[in-house]
């Protein structure tokens, strides 16, 4: 067919005289509004967090967890209440990211979706509440003695747990320690990647960073001697373990340590020491959740609220002791039972095979009421498979001879860096009409941005 026009249009001329936004809306970068709220209840706790375009964690066949050697696409620091609001510019093709932080009391890593309005939001309290509501509908009601446990273990009065291992006798309020204690615990259990003489990467953990804790150069005891009567709580901090471990305690006269496991009464504190945001499967706990321990009086055969002077508290961990949903349900054990798993580990070294040190206990000198305890469940000896702290109701109730918790010289760095790399491709006839092959000049680049954190 033939149509008529008032005048012939010069489409080439129109494009040259139009703003490029009118006909060229292609963009390789998107601006995303970022709102992060870790919902910390105490002030003065700032955390550094990263955003990745892939899961930054890898899991090996032996169950160990390690950080991938990759750069984040964004990095920032929260305010003193764990909040951050800002804008990040990232590649336009990214629709999902991973929020990651190695600071204690943060859920990490988490897969998040950028919404249609290019916003990325995270509220840790809401996230944890949603996780618990999802798991609650899948578990049975909790009744006394519903779950079985090994004959070596004993249960506190009125204690029980659900199918995820969440105890029923948790204290009603979260007990997160002061910010400086959290920074110090993170610092001492940190992992640092360094290059050896051959150029190969090597991960340094507490075993290498503090050899004096392990080589006998100082008096190291992981058991907790009580020198003044006090109530004692065990508070969950974090776990980097792939295993589902059970943690408990025992007591003995300080001047008469046990010679074998048959000499102690193992009492369950936390059936499953996995965080609720555990990547593999479902966990049970969040940082600051607390169990009040009780002293078993052998003479009266009763539990008491206070631990007397002259007794020592020891720790035991049942490796892979909690029967989780990921474990095959074809055998006689039910989900939520305490099973033999990979066997027991003790803080009293002579109870372990080859006298192996399985825990590290470090006293916070400033408070006089806090001791950080790290457990090693397997073979990497980072002592971060279950991290707790002990809180006593009385100051200076614990033997001051315990090694001191090292202080973090730089809890939050004054500056932090993030590196970007990529390829720039140029068209030499732009914006004129050309072949648009974008290969007239190609440049690979790496840039590092430094920001003030404070």
Provide a role label for each language-model segment.
Residues 2-8:
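Bacterial signal peptide processing site
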Residues 8-454:
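Extracellular distal adhesion/interaction modules in secreted or cell-surface proteins
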